[in-house]
Protein backbone atom coordinates (compact mmCIF):
# COMPACT_ATOMS: atom_id res chain seq x y z
CA UNK A 1 0.00 0.00 0.00
CA UNK A 2 1.66 3.20 -1.19
CA UNK A 3 1.73 5.62 1.74
CA UNK A 4 3.45 8.40 -0.21
CA UNK A 5 0.79 8.98 -2.86
CA UNK A 6 0.46 12.64 -3.79
CA UNK A 7 -2.65 14.23 -5.23
CA UNK A 8 -2.40 14.05 -9.01
CA UNK A 9 -5.31 16.30 -9.81
CA UNK A 10 -8.64 17.58 -8.60
CA UNK A 11 -11.62 16.62 -10.74
CA UNK A 12 -14.31 19.34 -10.63
CA UNK A 13 -18.01 18.66 -11.03
CA UNK A 14 -21.06 20.71 -11.93
CA UNK A 15 -22.68 21.96 -8.71
CA UNK A 16 -26.05 22.24 -10.45
CA UNK A 17 -26.25 18.49 -11.10
CA UNK A 18 -27.43 15.82 -8.69
CA UNK A 19 -24.98 13.72 -6.69
CA UNK A 20 -25.17 10.62 -8.87
CA UNK A 21 -24.38 12.57 -12.05
CA UNK A 22 -21.61 14.51 -10.32
CA UNK A 23 -19.99 11.33 -9.06
CA UNK A 24 -20.32 9.54 -12.40
CA UNK A 25 -18.63 12.40 -14.25
CA UNK A 26 -15.64 12.16 -11.90
CA UNK A 27 -15.15 8.43 -11.37
CA UNK A 28 -15.06 7.88 -15.12
CA UNK A 29 -11.74 9.74 -15.10
CA UNK A 30 -10.12 7.47 -12.48
CA UNK A 31 -7.55 5.18 -14.09
CA UNK A 32 -6.62 3.06 -11.07
CA UNK A 33 -8.14 -0.42 -10.73
CA UNK A 34 -9.00 0.17 -7.06
CA UNK A 35 -10.07 3.32 -5.26
CA UNK A 36 -10.60 4.46 -1.68
CA UNK A 37 -14.13 5.83 -1.33
CA UNK A 38 -14.53 8.67 1.18
CA UNK A 39 -16.80 11.62 1.80
CA UNK A 40 -15.21 15.00 2.45
CA UNK A 41 -16.13 14.98 6.15
CA UNK A 42 -14.54 11.58 6.81
CA UNK A 43 -11.55 12.94 8.73
CA UNK A 44 -8.69 10.59 9.62
CA UNK A 45 -7.83 11.07 13.29
CA UNK A 46 -5.19 8.35 13.75
CA UNK A 47 -2.66 6.49 11.62
CA UNK A 48 -4.23 3.90 9.28
CA UNK A 49 -2.97 0.32 9.33
CA UNK A 50 -1.28 0.38 5.93
CA UNK A 51 -0.20 -3.25 6.14
CA UNK A 52 -3.79 -4.35 6.73
CA UNK A 53 -5.06 -2.07 3.95
CA UNK A 54 -2.62 -3.69 1.53
CA UNK A 55 -3.83 -7.08 2.72
CA UNK A 56 -7.37 -6.02 1.86
CA UNK A 57 -6.34 -4.84 -1.60
CA UNK A 58 -4.76 -8.26 -2.08
CA UNK A 59 -8.07 -9.86 -1.06
CA UNK A 60 -9.83 -7.94 -3.84
CA UNK A 61 -7.11 -8.88 -6.32
CA UNK A 62 -7.39 -12.54 -5.40
CA UNK A 63 -11.20 -12.71 -5.43
CA UNK A 64 -12.67 -11.37 -8.66
CA UNK A 65 -16.22 -11.93 -7.37
CA UNK A 66 -15.71 -9.26 -4.69
CA UNK A 67 -16.38 -5.60 -5.48
CA UNK A 68 -15.59 -3.80 -2.23
CA UNK A 69 -14.39 -3.98 1.35
CA UNK A 70 -15.94 -1.58 3.84
CA UNK A 71 -13.40 -0.34 6.35
CA UNK A 72 -15.83 -0.26 9.28
CA UNK A 73 -18.82 -2.22 10.50
CA UNK A 74 -22.23 -0.61 10.21
CA UNK A 75 -25.72 -1.87 10.97
CA UNK A 76 -24.89 -5.40 9.82
CA UNK A 77 -27.16 -8.04 11.31
CA UNK A 78 -25.40 -11.11 9.93
CA UNK A 79 -22.02 -12.51 10.95
CA UNK A 80 -20.62 -14.52 8.05
CA UNK A 81 -16.82 -14.73 8.45
CA UNK A 82 -14.42 -14.47 5.53
CA UNK A 83 -11.29 -14.12 7.69
CA UNK A 84 -10.33 -13.05 11.22
CA UNK A 85 -11.10 -9.40 10.48
CA UNK A 86 -13.43 -9.58 7.48
CA UNK A 87 -17.10 -10.55 7.28
CA UNK A 88 -19.30 -11.09 4.24
CA UNK A 89 -21.89 -8.35 3.84
CA UNK A 90 -25.30 -9.91 3.36
CA UNK A 91 -27.00 -8.50 0.26
CA UNK A 92 -30.31 -8.37 2.17
CA UNK A 93 -28.89 -5.52 4.24
CA UNK A 94 -30.98 -2.36 3.70
CA UNK A 95 -27.76 -0.41 3.22
CA UNK A 96 -25.99 -3.01 1.11
CA UNK A 97 -24.57 -0.06 -0.80
CA UNK A 98 -23.25 2.46 1.66
CA UNK A 99 -21.13 5.58 1.66
CA UNK A 100 -18.99 4.07 4.40
CA UNK A 101 -15.24 4.46 3.82
CA UNK A 102 -14.41 1.52 1.56
CA UNK A 103 -11.92 0.02 -0.86
CA UNK A 104 -13.70 -0.44 -4.20
CA UNK A 105 -13.03 -2.07 -7.51
CA UNK A 106 -13.34 1.18 -9.47
CA UNK A 107 -15.19 -0.27 -12.46
CA UNK A 108 -17.88 -1.79 -10.22
CA UNK A 109 -18.43 1.45 -8.31
CA UNK A 110 -18.81 3.20 -11.65
CA UNK A 111 -21.47 0.68 -12.77
CA UNK A 112 -23.59 1.30 -9.67
CA UNK A 113 -23.68 5.01 -10.48
CA UNK A 114 -24.15 4.40 -14.20
CA UNK A 115 -27.30 2.34 -13.67
CA UNK A 116 -28.48 4.07 -10.50
CA UNK A 117 -31.23 6.72 -10.39
CA UNK A 118 -30.28 10.39 -10.68
CA UNK A 119 -30.67 11.38 -7.04
CA UNK A 120 -28.90 13.42 -4.37
CA UNK A 121 -27.20 11.85 -1.34
CA UNK A 122 -29.93 13.08 0.99
CA UNK A 123 -33.66 13.38 0.50
CA UNK A 124 -36.77 14.11 2.53
CA UNK A 125 -37.89 10.49 2.16
CA UNK A 126 -35.78 7.34 2.01
CA UNK A 127 -36.48 6.46 -1.64
CA UNK A 128 -35.15 9.88 -2.70
CA UNK A 129 -31.67 9.07 -1.35
CA UNK A 130 -29.10 7.63 -3.75
CA UNK A 131 -27.52 5.49 -1.02
CA UNK A 132 -30.83 3.69 -0.47
CA UNK A 133 -31.83 3.30 -4.13
CA UNK A 134 -28.33 2.16 -5.12
CA UNK A 135 -28.59 -0.92 -2.90
CA UNK A 136 -31.18 -2.39 -5.28
CA UNK A 137 -28.91 -1.58 -8.22
CA UNK A 138 -25.95 -3.27 -6.52
CA UNK A 139 -28.03 -6.39 -5.87
CA UNK A 140 -29.22 -6.51 -9.49
CA UNK A 141 -25.60 -6.28 -10.68
CA UNK A 142 -24.55 -9.21 -8.49
CA UNK A 143 -22.23 -7.03 -6.42
CA UNK A 144 -20.60 -8.79 -3.46
CA UNK A 145 -18.59 -7.29 -0.63
CA UNK A 146 -16.99 -7.63 2.78
CA UNK A 147 -16.65 -5.41 5.82
CA UNK A 148 -13.86 -5.00 8.37
CA UNK A 149 -14.57 -5.76 12.03
CA UNK A 150 -11.96 -6.52 14.66
CA UNK A 151 -13.91 -6.08 17.89
CA UNK A 152 -14.10 -2.28 17.67
CA UNK A 153 -16.56 -0.34 19.83
CA UNK A 154 -19.79 1.07 18.48
CA UNK A 155 -19.77 4.82 17.83
CA UNK A 156 -23.17 6.47 17.91
CA UNK A 157 -26.16 4.75 16.34
CA UNK A 158 -25.03 3.47 12.95
CA UNK A 159 -21.26 2.91 12.92
CA UNK A 160 -18.39 1.19 14.66
CA UNK A 161 -14.84 2.48 15.02
CA UNK A 162 -12.14 1.11 12.73
CA UNK A 163 -8.63 0.06 13.71
CA UNK A 164 -7.59 -0.30 10.09
CA UNK A 165 -8.80 3.17 9.04
CA UNK A 166 -9.65 5.44 12.01
CA UNK A 167 -11.96 8.16 10.68
CA UNK A 168 -14.98 10.25 11.61
CA UNK A 169 -18.23 8.97 10.13
CA UNK A 170 -19.23 11.78 9.93
CA UNK A 171 -17.51 14.91 11.21
CA UNK A 172 -20.53 16.95 10.10
CA UNK A 173 -24.22 16.13 10.56
CA UNK A 174 -26.65 18.39 8.70
CA UNK A 175 -23.93 21.03 8.51
CA UNK A 176 -23.08 20.91 12.23
CA UNK A 177 -19.90 19.63 13.88
CA UNK A 178 -20.60 16.14 15.26
CA UNK A 179 -19.12 16.73 18.71
CA UNK A 180 -21.61 14.38 20.37
CA UNK A 181 -19.98 11.36 18.72
CA UNK A 182 -16.45 12.59 17.94
CA UNK A 183 -15.85 15.29 20.54
CA UNK A 184 -12.37 14.10 21.58
CA UNK A 185 -11.18 13.49 18.03
CA UNK A 186 -12.51 16.78 16.67
CA UNK A 187 -11.06 18.78 19.56
CA UNK A 188 -7.65 17.29 18.74
CA UNK A 189 -8.04 18.19 15.06
CA UNK A 190 -9.18 21.67 16.08
CA UNK A 191 -5.94 22.23 17.99
CA UNK A 192 -3.74 20.76 15.25
CA UNK A 193 -5.33 22.65 12.35
CA UNK A 194 -6.75 25.79 13.96
CA UNK A 195 -10.40 24.96 13.24
CA UNK A 196 -12.86 27.58 14.48
CA UNK A 197 -15.92 25.69 15.70
CA UNK A 198 -17.81 28.97 16.16
CA UNK A 199 -18.17 29.38 12.39
CA UNK A 200 -20.78 26.64 12.38
CA UNK A 201 -22.90 25.16 15.15
CA UNK A 202 -22.43 21.70 16.62
CA UNK A 203 -24.53 18.78 17.78
Q: Language-model segments: which ranges?
A:
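Active-site-proximal specificity loops/subdomain of glycosyltransferases
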Residues: 1-31
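Catalytic core and acceptor-binding pocket of nucleotide-sugar-dependent glycosyltransferases
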Residues: 94-180
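Conserved donor-nucleotide/metal-binding helix-loop-beta segment in metal-dependent transferases, i.e.
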Residues: 46-75
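Acidic metal-phosphate-binding loop of nucleotide-sugar-dependent transferases
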Residues: 42-44
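Short, flexible, basic/aromatic active-site loop/helix in glycosyltransferases
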Residues: 80-94, 108
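Catalytic metal- and UDP-sugar-binding loop of GT-A-like glycosyltransferases, i.e.
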Residues: 38
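Terminal low-complexity segments of carbohydrate-biosynthetic enzymes
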Residues: 187-203
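Short aromatic/hydrophobic "clamp" motif used to bind/position activated sugar donors
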Residues: 35
Amino acid sequence: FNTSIKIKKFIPYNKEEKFRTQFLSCIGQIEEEYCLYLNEDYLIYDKPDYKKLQEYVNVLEGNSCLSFIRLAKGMDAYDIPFSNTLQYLDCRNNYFFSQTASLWRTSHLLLIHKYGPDLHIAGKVMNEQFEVAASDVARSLGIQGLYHYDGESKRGTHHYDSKVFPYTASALVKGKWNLSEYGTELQKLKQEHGIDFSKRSHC
